[in-house]
Amino acid sequence: MRLLIKQRVFSWTDTFDIYDETGNPKYFVKGELFSLGHRLHVYDASGQEIGLVRGKLALLPVFEIELHGAYLGRIEKRFTLFRPKYDLEYRGWRAEGDFLGWNYDVYEACCVAVHVTKEPFHWGDTYVIDFSNPADELPALLLVLAIDAANCSGS
């Protein structure tokens, strides 16, 4: 299964449109302009809020993710000199790869649960999330949004 994340270029806040593999709108994401810490609200196609990525005040970027109002997990950027690394607190998932180049995998045990790539030659950033388990769709989306927010935080 696949989701496409397209970032809107001319927007005051982080705004993303999310499409399914056939190109139909599935979700949209809207960031808060004035908030203490980074906040991204995820809505389904009918406009109901279904998820939240919330930045916590910390020395390095830390993000909590919520699904349908319930705590789902946490993503924390580790201190490294050259390449960013993240600690994930969700079902034993771990992320490896090139986060700044948007080519990374999320593993559950020894298997790839989610594969993330950046599509070249698009107006604005376009990311592709591939996953095999339909139950991983929203957790994977929230995780990718949190990693994007952590990369953009500049820490």
Q: What do the PLM-derived regions correspond to, one by one?
A:
Residues 1-155:
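Intrinsically disordered, low-complexity proline/glycine-rich segments
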